[in-house]
Amino acid sequence: MAGSAPEAVLVGLGAIPGAWLRLKVVNHFQPMVPKKHWGTFLVNVVACFALGLVLALNETCTASTGIALLMGVGFFGSLSTFSTFAVELLNELRAGQLLTALVLAVASIGVGLLACAVGYGIGTHA
């Protein structure tokens, strides 16, 4: 059943509110010039935590594949945004802000991985 129409519908139904929430969060932080990356950072960290949790629950509680597709692939997959993260890094590098780009990259990957591990840990003990 991989790639079936019902699975695509579940992913799509989850993706719509996830993408909308990402837009709202990123736009909320965008006018705050000193904190211009916080919106992207926040949605990515939240999505990492949630995907870790969904993965663990799917493994330990035999959560429905439909729930994993709806929430994991759809909602949290569209909430996170690696491409925007990459563009923000590129913009910092183009502006000569090597230290800012380095801190952003290390913090985003490190905190994202930690959030994913915490979500997974919570999910395995649920």
Curated annotation (Swiss-Prot):
- Positions bound to Na(+): G77, S80
- Keyword Lyase tagged: no
Q: One GO CC annotation, please?
A: plasma membrane
Residue ranges crossing the lipid bilayer per the database entry: 37-57, 67-87, 98-118
Means of activity regulation:
Na(+) is not transported, but it plays an essential structural role and its presence is essential for fluoride channel function.
Reactions catalysed: fluoride(in) = fluoride(out)
Note the superkingdom of the native organism.
Answer: Bacteria
Q: In which compartments does the protein localize?
A: Cell inner membrane
InterPro entries cross-referenced by the UniProt entry: FluC
Note the topology in the membrane: Multi-pass membrane protein
Give the main localization category: membrane
Gene Ontology MF terms: fluoride channel activity; metal ion binding
User: What's a GO biological-process term for it?
Assistant: cellular detoxification of fluoride
Q: What's a Pfam family this protein contains?
A: CRCB
Which UniProt keywords are listed? Cell inner membrane, Cell membrane, Ion channel, Ion transport, Membrane, Metal-binding, Sodium, Transmembrane, Transmembrane helix, Transport
Query: Could you tell me which HAMAP family the record lists for this protein?
Result: FluC (MF_00454)
Q: Which family does it belong to?
A: Belongs to the fluoride channel Fluc/FEX (TC 1.A.43) family.
Q: What does this protein do?
A: Fluoride-specific ion channel. Important for reducing fluoride concentration in the cell, thus reducing its toxicity.
- Protein name, entry field: Fluoride-specific ion channel FluC 1
Provenance organism: Synechococcus sp. (strain CC9605)
Q: Which gene encodes it?
A: fluC1
